[in-house]
Amino acid sequence: MKPHEYRDLIAAYVDVNFGPRGVVVYTEVSLGKTIIGKSRKLDILALRRSDQRALALEAKYQQVQGTTDEKIPYALQDLEALWIPGCLVYAGAGWSKGVLHTLEGSRRAVCCEPS
């Protein structure tokens, strides 16, 4: 699975399960700046229209070991700095033990592999 396919899978899951409750799902949404001053692009933004509550989701998928591992600490710090609630959603068998430890210990990360 490619990273954008995982993002779309998570977006579809949120839409199917929460769309009937008034949640609208957007992908690739521009939202302010990152902690290093770059323009931020969220993978997924879930918005409940009735009260304008929002949730940012960053989707990370890694099937084989690679450079995505190196991006996780930054992604978690960037989510902490967001002015709306956010979560890093991850899956795949390619995470190193150290990064898995970081993800599993973070209150901002959740393993999610919808079928």
List where the protein language model places each region.
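Charged, structured surface patches that assemble and position nucleic-acid processing machinery
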Residues: 104-115
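Residue-level "edge-of-site" marker
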Residues: 31, 92, 115
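Acidic-basic catalytic patches of nuclease active cores, encompassing PD-(D/E)XK
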Residues: 1-33
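Active-site metal-binding core of divalent-cation-utilizing nuclease and nuclease-like domains
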Residues: 21-51, 66
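Catalytic cores of nucleic-acid endonucleases
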Residues: 50-55, 60-106
